[in-house]
Amino acid sequence: VPVIAAKWGWEMAFLVIGAIGFIWMGFWIFMYKKPHVHPLVNKAELDYINQDTIAETKANNNVEVKEKKIPFLQAFKFRQTWAFAFGKFMTDGVWWFYLFWTPAYLSDVYGLTSDTTMAKTLIFVLYAIVMLSIIGGWLPKYFVDKLGMNPYAGRMRAMLIFAFFPLLALLAQPLGHTSYWFPVIIIGIAGAAHQAWSANLFSTIGDMFPKSAIATITGIGGMAGGIGAFIINKGSGALFDFSSGTTLINGKAEVMTKEFLAAGAQYLDMPMKFFGFEGIRAGYFIVFCVCAVAYLIGWI
């Protein structure tokens, strides 16, 4: 995306990425088939896919029971729905904050704009670290297979462990005084923890609800996560403007920027100070603190 934006502008970056999405949608529409009719799925693979269904059928003396669907509004009467939705509300926004604001963070705090080689390298390393999230599928399986825990308890224990890793975000700003590598690595670890957490959170739906309700509960959780993401990203932008202070430009109060400051502009409202950080750095520290504790709150 930075390469496209630097060469053809940010508008073209949106268009190109969006077009790729439509191409992928075309593959999905024309190539996807249900496993039992897909020509490339052999019997062994089909049996593996259907192993849970086969086991359930045998457990019910080979009599399939038609599950009753849960109406949308009825789903809100279950505590489990609110538990899942709250977990999504608290944590989805953290991922989107890191995704959207990390390039701006590197630019605001370290002067590394997205078109520089170092910024691209840092972003690449960050997302490479996020790939560690594959552990998210292994750990609960270990608890279930090796320790004999039931699937739900195993997933919840794994999620609790993953919820502690984002606490490293509390150190992103303090260690960032030494090198920009520290916050980048920490954000990468927090991102990996989020994806591991999120994968297990989605899996808990199947533990708490029948198959007929999974789509409904997933949709409710997605809605809650979207609301949380909107709040944290919109709120972060407002906080960063507020923490930067203001200056008077042509008789109008404007957010103080590095460019205004370099041109000799004077502060109308002084920048925020918080725990030794000043200006937009203080704003980022506050948001990092929120992101750090969000998973433990969501787990509870």
Language-model region placement:
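C-terminal transmembrane helical hairpin of 12-TM major facilitator-type secondary transporters
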Residues: 152-200
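Juxtamembrane intracellular "pre-TM" segments in multi-pass secondary transporters
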Residues: 35-85, 109-112
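Paired intracellular helix-loop junctions of major facilitator superfamily
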Residues: 144-146, 205-214
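Helix-loop-helix hairpin linking two adjacent transmembrane segments in secondary transporters
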Residues: 1-39
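Interfacial helix-cap and linker-helix signal at transmembrane-aqueous boundaries
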Residues: 1-8, 106-107, 139-140, 144, ...
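Loop-to-transmembrane helix entry/capping segments in MFS-fold secondary transporters
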Residues: 114-116, 211-220
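Multi-pass alpha-helical transporter architecture, strongest
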Residues: 24-32, 167-175, 276-277, 284-300
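Extracytoplasmic gate region of multi-pass secondary transporters
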Residues: 73-138, 190, 194-202, 206, ...
